[in-house]
């Protein structure tokens, strides 16, 4: 019973010794746990350096690696072949002012327009293939109708325009002065195809910039999050990180 009263009573607070006033310029007084952590970190680094020295001594300079065929060295130091990783000012502004949702939305819009332009280019190119033989087959009931068949009358156009395979103008349109000044030529097709190709190239470049911006923002978001990570290597001038596996609960 007496021990219970003894434990219930207030006890003296044991505080750790602080840094003396005359030594305050040296910062906080180091405790044993601080020294142990610093010593453990020092020993870990020394072990890594020892392993690296052993690997350097055991390395055979005449040994062949397949990476030697596409790698370069300068004074024995490997050089990384960097791609054009520069980002223009517009992309930097996007990184600073917009979030990844805005980038993904506009990238989806660009992809849809790229697909539409690719289909449009295939359609325009298919219309003007001069080497392709194009035929329009008309079926009749008997031989007599086949002999008396008039293509101009069947297509309701003139004899001059009946040979066209597309954009065939009808007589009522000619009488109403419609489409008479709109000849469908190969130059028009080439201009349309050239315009579509130029726009497609510009949109592909913009999609590539948006993809780089999305990758940069996603990497920054992951680096700011929780979890242990380690920088493993650099590929094409870009760092590659590896995160520690965590148990899902």
UniProtKB/Swiss-Prot annotation:
InterPro entries the record matches: SSU_processome_Utp11 (IPR007144)
Keyword 4Fe-4S in annotation: no
GO cellular component assignments: mitotic spindle; nucleolus; nucleus; small-subunit processome
Protein keywords: Nucleus, rRNA processing
Subcellular location: Nucleus, Nucleolus
Disordered: annotated segments: 1-24, 37-59, 223-249
Main subcellular location: nucleus
Keyword rRNA processing: yes
GO molecular function annotations of the record: snoRNA binding
Matching Pfam families: Utp11
GO BP annotations, alphabetical order: maturation of SSU-rRNA
Oligomer status and interactors: Component of the ribosomal small subunit (SSU) processome.
PANTHER family membership: U3 SMALL NUCLEOLAR RNA-ASSOCIATED PROTEIN 11, U3 SMALL NUCLEOLAR RNA-ASSOCIATED PROTEIN 11-RELATED
Primary role: Involved in nucleolar processing of pre-18S ribosomal RNA.
Membership in a protein family: Belongs to the UTP11 family.
Protein name per UniProt: Probable U3 small nucleolar RNA-associated protein 11
Species per Swiss-Prot/TrEMBL record: Schizosaccharomyces pombe (strain 972 / ATCC 24843)
Gene designation per UniProt: utp11
């Amino acid at each position: 019973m007496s021990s219970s009263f003894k434990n219930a009573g207030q006890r003296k607070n044991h505080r750790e010794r602080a840094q003396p006033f005359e030594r305050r310029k040296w910062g906080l007084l180091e405790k044993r746990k601080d020294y142990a952590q610093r010593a453990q970190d020092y020993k870990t680094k020394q072990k890594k350096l020892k392993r690296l020295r052993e690997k350097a001594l055991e390395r055979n300079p005449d040994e062949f690696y397949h990476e030697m065929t596409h790698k370069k060295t300068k004074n024995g130091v490997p050089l990384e072949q960097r791609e054009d990783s520069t980002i223009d000012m517009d992309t930097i502004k996007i990184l600073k002012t917009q979030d990844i949702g805005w980038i993904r939305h506009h990238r989806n819009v660009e992809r849809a327009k790229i697909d539409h332009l690719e289909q449009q280019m295939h359609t325009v190119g298919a219309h003007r293939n001069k080497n392709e033989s194009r035929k329009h087959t008309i079926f009749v009931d008997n031989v007599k109708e086949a002999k008396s068949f008039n293509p101009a009358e069947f297509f309701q156009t003139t004899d001059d325009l009946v040979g066209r395979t597309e954009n065939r103008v009808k007589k009522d349109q000619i009488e109403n002065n419609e489409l008479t000044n709109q000849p469908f030529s190969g130059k028009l097709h080439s201009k349309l195809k050239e315009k579509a190709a130029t726009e497609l190239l510009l949109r592909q470049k913009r999609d590539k910039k948006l993809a780089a911006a999305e990758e940069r923002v996603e990497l920054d978001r992951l680096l700011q999050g929780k979890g242990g990570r380690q920088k493993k290597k650099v590929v094409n001038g870009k760092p590659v990180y590896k995160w520690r596996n965590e148990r899902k609960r």
